[in-house]
């Protein structure tokens, strides 16, 4: 028997209501009532939090955090996220985004971000961001490289290639 289900999701989360307020990298631009849907379908308790927050808790309990009461965890993937555990408590902050560093503006004239802003950290440092930067820089690059050739040939390029 299951006691309940816990889930981490990208984007802004209302942990009280169990809704995803906006997960732009998943193209969720409207409120998603995840808790209501899961609980009504399965009949067991459901808890929801931001994926970087959940990862920070996991890293604190079972990972490099070694159960330290103070842990900061940064996630790099489609976006850039972060979770902060201070004095043993997960910090949520406004809209559950205490550690969400991906949407800090690092270049006001930078690339457009999925959140609607311009020049966010994740536009250049996430898995998709480093590919975007490589494609942008390859336009001016006059040297010889396998990456430049792949981009020029229209091949799919991933962050692993970069």
Task: State where each predicted segment sits.
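A mobile "lid/hinge" subdomain adjacent to the ATP/sugar-phosphate binding pocket shared
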Residues: 121-162
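Glycine-rich phosphate-binding loop and adjoining helix at the ATP-binding site
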Residues: 3-5, 12-72
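Generic secondary-structure signature for well-ordered alpha-helical cores
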Residues: 62, 90, 106, 135-139
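Active-site/binding-pocket entry motifs
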Residues: 11-13, 110, 136
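Hydrophobic alpha-helical segments typical of transmembrane helices
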Residues: 33-34, 56, 80, 100, ...
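Glycine-rich phosphate-binding loop of actin/hexokinase-like ATP-binding domains
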Residues: 67-124
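Short glycine-rich anion-binding loops that position phosphate/pyrophosphate groups of nucleotides
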Residues: 10-13, 77-79
């Amino acid at each position: 028997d299951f006691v309940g289900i816990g889930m981490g999701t990208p984007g802004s989360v209302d942990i009280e209501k169990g809704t995803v307020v906006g997960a732009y990298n998943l193209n969720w631009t409207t409120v998603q009532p995840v808790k209501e849907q899961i609980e009504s379908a399965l009949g067991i308790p459901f808890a929801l939090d931001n994926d970087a927050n959940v990862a920070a808790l996991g890293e604190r309990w079972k990972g490099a955090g070694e159960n330290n009461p103070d842990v900061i965890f940064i996630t790099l993937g489609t976006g850039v996220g972060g979770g902060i555990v201070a004095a043993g408590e997960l910090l949520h902050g406004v809209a559950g985004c205490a550690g969400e560093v991906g949407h800090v503006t690092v270049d006001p004239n930078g690339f457009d971000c999925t959140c609607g802003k311009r020049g966010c950290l994740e536009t250049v440092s996430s898995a998709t961001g480093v590919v975007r930067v490589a494609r942008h820089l390859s336009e001016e690059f006059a040297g010889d490289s396998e990456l430049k050739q792949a981009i020029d040939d229209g091949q799919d390029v991933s962050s692993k290639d970069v």
